[in-house]
Structure formats: C-alpha cells, structure tokens
Design a protein with these regions (language model features):
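Conserved catalytic cores of soluble enzyme domains
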Residues: 122-263
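Cleft-lining beta-strand/loop regions that shape enzyme active-site pockets
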Residues: 55, 64-150, 156-161, 166
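Short low-complexity stretches enriched in small and charged residues
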Residues: 15-25, 75-78, 115, 132-137, ...
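Short charge-dense sequence patches
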Residues: 41, 49-62, 90-99, 169-174, ...
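Intrinsically disordered, low-complexity segments enriched in small/flexible residues
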Residues: 1-74, 78-83, 93, 239, ...
C-alpha cells in the first residue's frame, strides 16, 4: 500500500520543474492552436473604472488563444510556470502580470461572443507584485476576472495543474466544472508567505506548519467543495508520468465537455453560484449540541468568580492601562442638544488623570 503523502511533499511536487505544464498539455491534447495575437477580431484593450483605456501586451506567464479539442473549437487561458532554473526570469518567476489577467478577461468576452467552451489551466505562484502591474490595476483585473467567470454565458472548465496561488488562481478557477491534479495545491497564499507572517521566519519546519494550517491539497479542496473532482496523477519519478497524466486529463476533459454540452447555460450558472455560496459554510449544529452548549454556559456563569474591576472596561484596555484607579476615557466628539459638534475628538483612549 502506498504511503499517504504529506502536504509538504505534495507542495514539493506542485512546484517541481518537471511537473506537467500548460504548454505540454496544449501541445498534446489540442490541435490548431492560435494565439490571441493571430485572432482578427480580438481587441487587447480594456476600459478602466476611470474611463481610460488600458492597452494590453503579451504576458510570458500566460498562454491565451483558441484551439480544437477533439474536433470542437474551444478558448484556452493557461498559466505557464518555468520548467527550469534558466526559465525563471523569462516566465516572471511564475507570477502572472496585469497584462495576462487583462488578456484573460478579453478572451472570456471572446469565448462568450462566439460560444466557445472555455478551458482554463491554473499554475501560478500568485499575481505579480511589482509596480508595473499595480499601475495597470492588477487587483481590479483579478476581481473582474472572478466576476466575469461567474457571469459567463458560455460553458467553462477549470483545472489546477500545479500551484494555485492566491487571487491570481481564483481569477481563472470559478468555472462550471472545477478539477485539480492530485499533486497540486490551491491556497489563498503561498506557504512561504504564510510562514513569514505567522512564524516570522521561513524554514522547512515553518513551511510545513503553514501547509498544515492552509490545507491546500486536492483532498482538502474536495472535502470543502472547492473543486468537483481530483484527476489521478502518478508520482513525478514515474517513467510514464507525462503520458499517464495527459491520458487522465484528456479523459476528464472529455467527460466534462459531454456533461456540459447537455446542460442549459442558465442551470449551469445557478449550479456554479450555489457551489460558490456553499464554500466555507459550516454545517448546522445538532440539537443535542445546542442543549449541551447552553448547559455548559449556565454552569460556567454560575461558577465563575465575580469580576472586581469595572465590567465596562475591556480586557485589552486593562492590559494597556493596568488595574489602577485611572479608568481610561475616550476622547470622543462632543455634540450639543441640537446635534451640533461642540468639540471634535480623536476617539483615542487616555488615562483620566
């Protein structure tokens, strides 16, 4: 029997250079791929919230175009990460830039216009953190991609194939069918970032601890209803790893395409919105739990010692000001009987003395 892999081991696989990449999938499973630059009526521009025009350029970490999947025209949005240390800078270290998300948004519109099923492949550390992407409104573009996928009037399939990092991954994952390769991760933050925030240091131990907290594996995602199914994937050292994984991907995409083709788009939209609404929802407690909780609360209130300090002073205030007689007072705005401001206050707390 194979030993169950830890989250740390799965994360190592998800970030490995020899993990399957989007370009390999497109070359093996699709035919007649045409990049967005070759589409005659594809407009790489967007209107910003302030009314200005955003001109978009090629993002090396994003593959966008149209192709055929088993004879059917589809639109493709795929994130590409480096396959070697030498490719790291060429692919922006696996970080998708604002231009990539802008082009993805344009491709979503294109797919809806021509009734193309949208296939997205997610593999990114996260959104690009540099100033150039911020200047092109990357956070707004990521949010727009998420909203657009939820309202898209064409069928969509999303597959996480490596790293699903932060909002940059969510932007392409809100599809009618959502899958994940077994040796992939999906999380709100990279474990290194989580470790730096929670533990103030990034080591093997803190990364492993962060992964246990984040619970980013495919099994966790199925458990929480964030994906629909896991696509089987052999160990990376398997000599037939690539061929076996491609076969599994092809089978799942074929099955999903057949399912979606027979469903009405309105029903798919409602189903997707219901799935998203259920994410993170905790089951209602059983009646026996409620009764036990009420009993324990009454018992605790009966047995707890009397509070000798002012009950209106929060614990945090006592911690800051101590238990002296100098009760902290808030410097609030003072108004007269008619509601006119007599004295402006900052709201900060000061000792009464």
């Amino acid at each position: 029997m194979l030993r169950k892999m830890t989250a740390r081991e799965i994360y190592r696989c998800a970030t490995a250079y020899h993990k399957i990449k989007s370009r390999q999938i497109i070359e093996a499973l699709y035919t007649d791929f045409t990049s967005w630059e070759g589409l005659l009526d594809f407009a790489p521009t967007l209107r910003a919230p302030n009314g200005s025009t955003i001109s978009l350029t090629k993002d090396p970490a994003m593959i966008i175009g149209v192709a055929q999947f088993q004879g059917t025209d589809v639109a493709i949005i795929a994130q590409q990460t480096p396959q070697s240390a030498q490719e790291r800078s060429a692919y922006n270290y696996g970080l998708t830039q604002a231009d990539g998300y802008g082009l993805a948004l344009c491709m979503m519109d294109y797919a809806e216009k021509y009734g193309l099923t949208l296939h997205t492949f997610i593999d990114t550390v996260g959104g690009d953190p540099f100033a150039a992407s911020a200047a092109k409104l990357q956070s707004w573009l990521i949010a727009r991609c998420q909203a657009r996928m939820l309202s898209l009037q064409t069928r969509s399939i999303a597959t996480i194939i490596g790293q699903g990092g932060s909002g940059g991954a969510i932007a392409l994952q809100l599809a009618h069918r959502r899958y994940m390769l077994a040796l992939s991760t999906y999380s709100v933050i990279a474990p290194e970032g989580c470790a730096a925030i929670l533990f103030r240091q990034v080591t093997e131990d803190t990364i492993a601890a962060a992964l246990e907290i984040l619970q980013p594996t495919a099994e966790h995602m199925v458990q929480y209803g964030i994906i629909d199914a896991i696509i089987a994937e052999p160990p990376l050292e398997d000599p037939h790893y690539l061929a076996t994984t491609l076969d599994s991907l092809s089978a799942m995409l074929t099955r999903a395409t057949t399912e979606l083709a027979s469903a009405a788009i309105d029903a798919l939209q409602q189903e997707l919105q219901d799935k998203i609404a259920r994410c993170g929802r905790i089951a209602e407690p059983q009646p026996w739990y409620r009764r036990g909780r009420r009993f324990a609360k009454r018992l605790w209130n009966f047995s707890r010692p009397a509070v000798t300090t002012d009950p209106h002073i929060a614990d945090i205030r006592r911690h800051v000001f101590g238990n002296s007689d100098c009760t902290p007072q808030a410097c609030n705005t003072v108004k007269d009987a008619d509601g006119n401001v007599v004295r402006h206050g900052c709201g900060h707390l000061f000792p009464a003395e």
